[in-house]
A protein has these predicted regions:
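C-terminal alpha-helical "lid/dimerization" subdomain adjacent to the S-adenosyl-L-methionine
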Residues: 164-215
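Conserved class I S-adenosyl-L-methionine
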Residues: 55-64
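N-terminal, positively charged/glycine-rich alpha-helical extensions of SAM-dependent methyltransferases
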Residues: 1-25
Length: 240
């Protein structure tokens, strides 16, 4: 379905929620809103395939409609278990339907949980947060990353894809302008862009790239590398 969530003028702005209205159009929304989203997915599969060990688990925190796990299932060993976590029950329902429709052979467990409260991880060789940490309240992010590090298998990888803010205000403003131009090229009009920005204002709170790297290193992760960068979007991988 085509994303028309913000197509009509709203009487008043409300906070963005991953409800059924968003879930139904999410796949279109994310492809049109995140530069090189499908390439990011392909890159994450390559990276995960390097670190996902047989008979361990891959965690997808903020699994949404299951796109990442579906992509992973085609390349990863069938003995790698998948655990998808999302706070939205509607997302998890869509995720399960998509996993079944795509014939995913790995064992998949789906859980509804608020990452602001932490997460329980078992036998994990790969943990993915694709456009997820930015929705966790800043107060709880470092604690969540530390918890992931503490529970992961040694040698495991964390893959973090985030919207970020620029290190300096001048380029940050330019990058935001370029991003809005990108959305216009993908057929979002100015009203849609403005209304979504207002809805996300207190929900999606990006950090600087340097802040995300520091948070990973403070938790104990090493060999932190940037594998993707497009203006105000970035992908990081780090090893325990």
């Amino acid at each position: 379905m085509i994303d028309k969530v913000f197509k009509e003028k709203a009487d008043q702005s409300t906070d963005f929620r991953f409800d059924k209205k968003v879930v139904d159009v999410f796949d279109d929304m994310v492809v049109r809103s995140v530069p090189y989203y499908l390439e990011i997915q392909r890159m994450m599969v390559e990276l995960a395939n390097t670190f996902a060990k047989p008979n361990t688990n891959l965690y997808d925190l903020g699994c949404s409609t299951g796109t990442t796990m579906i992509s992973m299932s085609k390349e990863l060993d069938k003995s790698v278990g998948f655990v998808g976590i999302d706070e939205s029950p509607q997302m998890l329902e869509s995720c399960r339907n998509n996993l079944d429709a795509n014939g995913v052979e790995q064992v998949v467990k789906l859980n509804s949980f608020d990452l602001n409260k932490g997460v329980e991880i078992e036998n994990a060789s790969v943990v993915i947060l694709c456009l997820t940490l930015q929705f966790v309240r800043p107060l709880y992010r470092a604690k969540l990353i530390q918890s992931i590090y503490d529970q992961m298998n040694p040698g495991g990888a964390i893959i973090l894809v985030e919207k970020v803010i620029g290190e300096g205000s001048d380029f940050n403003r330019k990058f935001i302008d370029y991003y809005y131009d990108y959305k216009r090229r993908n057929d979002y009009n100015d009203m849609e862009i403005a209304q979504k920005r207002e809805a996300l204002e207190n929900i999606l709170i990006p950090f600087k790239l340097s802040e995300n790297i520091h948070m990973l290193e403070e938790a104990g992760f090493k060999d932190c590398e940037t594998f993707f960068k497009w203006y105000n979007f970035t992908g990081l991988i780090a090893i325990k």
